[in-house]
């Protein structure tokens, strides 16, 4: 083949590929320009209310009182209060599509566990628990939509050769993603997006989406509270689990903690057993920690759960919180032995609480950024503060150890612990005298990690098989949208969310399929 013919074929191939990608960019955008404009102006609240975004419809998510099914244990009880103001949420196995750095699709499994502790009414906690999933999904959708569009536009100007193994997404900047859809209406969150597409992209986008969701929940409730003259507020502690990693965003004094296995030496074990024995005597035998249930490993030491608190309480007497409150003109004083903003509000950060906003009470969450889960991390607990009126953080993990390692007869373990691990926590705290509402979510992590790894591997294999079968590269034809179906989003307890990503999955499939097609064509032409 002469060089002129080869050059002509190459130019023809490039021209064909250009039109393929032009078609994708024009016809495969996940959101209409009018809906994108609505999103730019008002975020999630505006999108769900606008007739310009007809496919976005709010679901009426309920807050379950208890569940021990599957890998998500939840429980909420009114306790000794006149009203139940606590709400909770647990949703596992959410499949979200992300672009991989090598050009292959990557579906990430996501779990959400959250507790909202309301005060001065349940309006704020109720709204937050119902809106979180919808708002989180919407923001992920728009951020991913911008990401895929930035990717396709970048691809139009860059066609790698057969030997080019650098990623097709290299060099797509944060600003390209944000400004493509003008997603900079919340400038304080822009820096959380990565400069390049790599393995951290899904985690960065999920963090960004969660922060935006929390912001928009507060915006929505602020408007509602202003219209209805509501005085209620709520804490919010939300944990995300994805790709074997964990992050937590927290407002107020609800807690998140990890219970992780730890081996103690004989000397350390001796001190632990003495402490547990004294605790049991002090509580007249009602302590959840029964030292006989801790395992001695080959006589060399003790295996037990160690608690790691993932959140910091936003109490007004915390030095940095107090400085902010006083700088805004508020003051911190104690009443009934509890520090309060202006002598009343017991938290310095909250969703709602409009009357305290001018005194330094804010709704911005404090974030524990993504950290890897390890093999000895056994349980994630997210709970309202009512449980910790009578249980220390370590006692919670001691109780979970006892229940998790009980004998087959279940001797010594209360009957309510057989319902769920969350029921075990809230009822133990109630029996020990807690006066508050109580809500808890307990996620067994070991089974969750194994499942995520298995599904991640299966997803990668499925994606490779489906793309390969859909692209007969001898003809190098672009598959129709229905030729590749990566399946609906899977979310335990929240199946209706699956429809939200259908168009996004289709766009993802077309973009990556087209890339494989053009890469094969170019390599074939240049190899001749």
Curated annotation (Swiss-Prot):
Key word NADP present: no
Gene3D superfamilies: PPM-type phosphatase domain (3.60.40.10)
InterPro entries per UniProt: PP2C, PPM-type-like_dom_sf, PPM-type_phosphatase-like_dom
Keywords, alphabetical: Hydrolase, Magnesium, Manganese, Membrane, Metal-binding, Protein phosphatase, Transmembrane, Transmembrane helix
Pfam families the UniProt entry points to: PP2C
Domain PPM-type phosphatase: 71-445
Membrane protein topology class: Single-pass membrane protein
SUPFAM superfamilies named in the record: PP2C-like (SSF81606)
Known cofactor(s): Mg(2+); Mn(2+)
Source taxon at top rank: Eukaryota
Record note on cofactor: Binds 2 magnesium or manganese ions per subunit.
Molecular-function GO term, any one: metal ion binding
A cellular component term, taken from the record's GO annotations: membrane
Positions in coiled-coil regions: none
Family classification: Belongs to the PP2C family.
Protein name, as recorded: Probable protein phosphatase 2C 51
